[in-house]
């Protein structure tokens, strides 16, 4: 993790706790979840990961982005995760697609479940102020989520120099560097697993 941070990169482990196929659902027992699907995420937490992305789909009937048990009880309380959680692409807006809330209430559900950052839907920005004013969301939850997002930015050095990673010379030096590209190809080649050899 320090190696990533020193290069201005954050780590996001995706997608807790199961994949599913977009609008498909994942039905499984707790035994299967804890023995097969959650161990890699727990290992990432134990290794000090800085952020974790919730999955897009339903897990046992609940959108993972709005699953308080999964985010707060398992991830934070049982495993001690103190980093930032981020929704999968537009998944907070999609809570209403699953029929579990109106679109306007989806952000409140996700925030109460422990999802700190809304990726793309804009619902946190557009609806949480009104939800706090109505008393539907405790302002302390907004503060807690904001703190985690700001801590992630602090670790990346964005408060010292917000444009530090927007320098064109970094493209050739860091991103398009031949040694880095070679290493990336080698790492990718080692990830393939032969399932069946005919």
Task: Walk through the language-model features, giving the residues of each.
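Glycoside hydrolase catalytic-domain context in secreted enzymes
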Residues: 1, 7, 11-198
